[in-house]
Curated annotation (Swiss-Prot):
Signal sequence segment: none
Its job: Nucleoside triphosphate pyrophosphatase that hydrolyzes 7-methyl-GTP (m(7)GTP). May have a dual role in cell division arrest and in preventing the incorporation of modified nucleotides into cellular nucleic acids.
Cofactor needs: a divalent metal cation
Gene Ontology BP annotations: nucleotide metabolic process
Lineage: Bacteria, Pseudomonadati, Pseudomonadota, Gammaproteobacteria, Enterobacterales
Similarity remark: Belongs to the Maf family. YceF subfamily.
Alphabetically ordered keywords of this record: Cytoplasm, Hydrolase, Nucleotide metabolism
GO MF annotation, one: nucleoside triphosphate diphosphatase activity
Name used for this protein in its record: 7-methyl-GTP pyrophosphatase
Gene3D superfamilies attached to this UniProt entry: 3.90.950.10
Pfam family, one: Maf
InterPro entries per UniProt: ITPase-like_fam, Maf-like
């Protein structure tokens, strides 16, 4: 079986990929994530997912390399990780009572053949109306400053929502496993038959 590389240092993506029970290693892609002018959310995450996967091709020349990127769109504005309490508070205040759409790009690059397959998965999060004290309490309790959208849906963040809509709940955490499984099977790696 071709060795798998996850082009990410994200603990969340690593934990998600472990669900497939395939051996893999993680490597930092060191990719410039600056958005381009007039680039929409879908174009941005697909470009960055592919760039992350291909960034490691010299070091890993006979591998399947997975790249992923995620942004959220709140009221038509592309946002990413808040990195500060103030930005996180602003993001959650903007999301309050609205639908926030997460765009997650996933790319599988076969560095041996040069074949790349890149997709974008959408996931909608409908927030309930949030009071400022609820937002402060949540941010203090969970400190989600390294998470797109300023929450962790796998934790206390679930209390912020009215409902969730999407094909794969793993997409919201950063790695759409249903789509990734499809891409892996197309490259000859089936997680079910690889269990051994």
């Amino acid at each position: 079986m071709t060795q798998i590389i996850l082009a990410s240092t994200s603990a969340y993506r690593r934990m998600l990929l472990e669900k497939l029970r395939l051996p893999f290693i993680c490597a930092a892609p060191n990719t410039d994530e600056t958005p381009r002018m007039n680039e929409n959310a879908e174009q941005l995450v697909m470009r960055l997912a592919q760039a992350k996967a291909q960034a490691l091709q010299t070091k890993y020349s006979q591998h399947l390399i997975i790249g992923s990127d995620q942004v959220c769109v709140i009221n038509g504005e592309i946002t990413g990780k808040p990195h500060s309490f103030e930005h996180a508070f602003k993001q959650l205040r903007q999301a309050s009572g609205h639908c926030v759409t997460f765009y997650t790009g996933i790319s599988l690059f076969n560095s041996k053949t040069g074949i790349t397959d890149t997709r974008c998965e959408l996931f909608n999060v409908y927030f309930r109306e949030l009071a400022d004290d609820e937002i402060r309490a949540y941010l203090t309790a969970e400190n989600p400053l390294n998470c797109a959208g300023s929450f962790k849906s796998e934790g206390l963040g679930i209390t912020l929502f009215e409902r969730l809509e999407g094909k794969d709940p793993n997409t919201l955490i950063g790695l759409p496993l249903i789509t990734l499984t499809e891409l892996l099977i197309r490259q000859g790696v089936n997680p079910l038959t690889a269990i051994g």
